A protein has these predicted regions:
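An acidic/histidine-cluster motif and surrounding catalytic segment
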Residues: 1-5, 10-203
Length: 203
């Protein structure tokens, strides 16, 4: 069984559904893939001829998954904290910059400063070394972004989401990607993770 999840402020292109359904079929037996995402927070990413890429970062704005993957997710953040505080977590997350950031976010979740299931879902997939399919062109327009929003106001909207554009004329050749995600993930991290030493000391 599969499910496509669209929140009320996420507007998809017509290509979104074609993309999601094709990827669900292609990766249904690949347990390393946890979800299919419709949004690309860099708006467009073209490092190869493929129409999608594989990333360690999950995007919750228009996505899909399989029942067997979803049922295995542990949403107990206290259990996650034990793992994240373990020095071996660096092997799951890839860099100390990412490690300090995600520890900081998890502590804010445990103090009820952030209320988002998507962060917990990301942590679980980090630990289990699961990945996500991301389209090389964005297929979702989130009309709920702003200072009054529930979650996005805590993110670097000016530098991150301002670049997110809806590609209405997107067409896919469906040339398939390999596990070749380092450059995309690094580009996402360069935007999400502050380069300010003062801000990073807070982590």
């Amino acid at each position: 069984k599969t499910a496509i999840i669209l929140e009320d402020d996420c507007l998809p292109t017509k290509e979104f559904f074609c993309f999601i359904n094709l990827m669900l079929k292609r990766y249904k037996n690949n347990k390393k893939i946890s979800s299919i995402c419709g949004s690309n927070h860099l708006s467009t990413w073209k490092s190869s001829d493929s129409s999608y890429l594989i990333s360690k970062y999950f995007n919750s704005w228009g996505w899909a998954t399989w029942q067997d993957r979803w049922q295995k997710v542990d949403f107990d953040n206290k259990n996650l904290l034990k793992v994240v505080n373990n020095h071996k977590f660096i092997h799951h997350i890839g860099s100390y910059r990412a490690l300090f950031y995600w520890r900081y976010i998890l502590k804010k979740i445990l103090r009820n400063k952030i209320n988002s299931w998507a962060y917990t879902y990301n942590y679980f997939n980090f630990i289990k070394k699961k990945y996500h399919i991301i389209p090389t062109q964005n297929l979702i327009n989130n009309v709920g972004i702003g200072i009054k929003s529930t979650n996005t106001k805590v993110l670097p909207v000016k530098y991150f989401f301002s670049k997110l554009k809806l590609n209405k004329t997107t067409s896919f050749s469906f040339k398939h990607d390999k596990y070749n995600f380092n450059k995309y993930d690094t580009a996402v991290e360069d935007i999400i993770f502050s380069k300010s030493l003062i801000n990073r000391i807070k982590w």
